[in-house]
Amino acid sequence: MSHLVKMENGQSQTIQEMLGCIERYNPDHLKTLEAYVQDQAKNNTYDLEANLAVLKLYQFNPHMLNFDITYTILLKCLTNLPHTDFVMAKCLLLPQQMKDENVQTIIDLADILERADFTLFWQRAEVNRNMFRHITGFHDSIRKFVSHVIGTTFQTIRKDLLKELLGGIEDSTLESWVKRNGWKHQGQGLVVVATQDDKIKTKNITEKIEFENVGALMAQCL
């Protein structure tokens, strides 16, 4: 769905065009931006710049604060881990947003993810499942982040542990994630995450530095 912003001169701009000019601070555009946030949740899309613009407008216009939109923005930031989007969004929150119980719950979920306590995360997510039920692809986005952490942590992992870390998934769902990440079954209930050949190999790099490149610097030291 295309969202157009109506300017005072009667012309229309796309949200991306509006965000590139002073109009991004016009509170008259807030409703359009909030509808755009809802569309991102529904259609599994993501626009960090637009979402941060919404939080900035709340800072300037606290009487227009919408907590439901705040929750959606923060949860969408979680779907883009390991990027630092959540930290940026959190820095724009007003005191009344920070005191909100649901906001604190989302912050707790973010902390749990950042310390890679995935078993606890899925337990808390189940308790609070209504909070992100409207966000299409939320669980798979988190599983993508979990897979990233697993890929940088393990060489091999037990199949039962892998299923647990990915949210207690069924065998059929596990197969799709194994295939998606290029992992392989080893037998004896193990999954190969990274082989020896996949490891990053160090390389010595020799750079030739001519005397004239450092001559001026050496002269200053005399």
From Swiss-Prot:
Keywords: Cytoplasm, Initiation factor, Protein biosynthesis. Residues 46-208 form the PCI domain. It holds the Pfam family CSN8_PSD8_EIF3K. The keyword Cytoplasm applies. Signal peptide: none annotated. GO terms for biological process: formation of cytoplasmic translation initiation complex; regulation of translational initiation. It comes from the Eukaryota. It is found in: Cytoplasm. GO terms for cellular component: eukaryotic 43S preinitiation complex; eukaryotic 48S preinitiation complex; eukaryotic translation initiation factor 3 complex. One of its GO terms (molecular function) is translation initiation factor activity. The keyword Protein biosynthesis applies. Component of the eukaryotic translation initiation factor 3 (eIF-3) complex, which is involved in protein synthesis of a specialized repertoire of mRNAs and, together with other initiation factors, stimulates binding of mRNA and methionyl-tRNAi to the 40S ribosome. The eIF-3 complex specifically targets and initiates translation of a subset of mRNAs involved in cell proliferation. Component of the eukaryotic translation initiation factor 3 (eIF-3) complex. The eIF-3 complex interacts with pix. Belongs to the eIF-3 subunit K family. This is Eukaryotic translation initiation factor 3 subunit K.
